[in-house]
Amino acid sequence: MKYRFAVALGLAVVMASGTSAQEKELVFGVTEGVTYQATPKEIRDKFTPLAEYVGKATGRRVKIVLVPAYNDVRAGMAKHEYDLVFIHPAHVAMAEVKGGRYKAVAWTSGFTDYTVSLLINPEGTLKSLDDLKGRTLVTPDPDSITAMMVRAMLRTGKLPMTTAKPDAQNAKEMEGSVRVISTRYQDAVPFYIENGFAQAGATAAKSVVKSWTDKGGKVLAQSRAVPIKQLLVSSALPADEQERIRAALLGIGQSKPGKDALDAIGYKGFVATNPEVEAATIAWLGL
């Protein structure tokens, strides 16, 4: 009888220990941009020091989960699979904020004013967004934040959009619409303009814009600014834990481990979110 009691007690202790260890683990999802090229190892190496820093600040082990596909991170957040998540594309992050499933606790310093530039050839006749009617505009991946912002620009300008190929049946419709095509990466956009596949191209990569303008290319228009690379916490986390994570991120530059994490990730730091900007951006993107 005593032996059975001891065995049962031992099993209970093991199970309780396992539960305690599981409760201490924070799942940190990481979703980078789809239009930039980086390997999973490069991304994990970048974020590991940040995960360790958050772990020390919260007293919990942090497990990194790389989620490259936007639809996968959407599905995961719908089920609160991540306690903390870093998301490059603002439209994916802010859809979760609007839905109440997650809260933005910090934005990445230097990435709160992400803008899209529409590139055109210097010898072209385009002078305004309205001149894009009947023309072709190339964007990066359709589910990228860049493409999402382009659609918001056109929608704000009351410009009809289409992805259809021109033919005899839709010729009249095409004349009054902007035909939008896509390529995977931002740095491929200039190729489409230079080779006549599109009359304008959208990019948010400053290096691409600089290279284009340095050789005489022009910028037709620039979008409003949007904060990208957001850090969100699950609304299912206790409020005090949400606050510990927020405070740790905002104060990351005040300690050596924090500075080391910033060096590894390549960012200057994190800043407080702005509810007014957040609400305005959600509305502009049509989320």
Predicted regions and their residues:
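Acidic, polar ligand-binding/catalytic clefts
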Residues: 67-131, 143-145, 156
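A ligand-binding cleft/hinge motif common to bilobed small-molecule-binding domains
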Residues: 89-99, 151-157, 190-219
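Bacterial N-terminal signal peptides
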Residues: 6-16
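Bilobed "Venus flytrap"/periplasmic-binding protein-like clamshell domains
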Residues: 31-55, 90, 114-191, 195
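Sec/Tat signal peptide C-region and signal peptidase I cleavage site
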Residues: 17-21
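Periplasmic-binding protein-like
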Residues: 24, 30-34, 110-120, 173-174, ...
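Extracytoplasmic small-molecule ligand-binding "clamshell" domains
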Residues: 22-93
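Short helices/loops that flank or line small-molecule/ion binding pockets
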Residues: 71-85, 98, 171-174, 179-198, ...
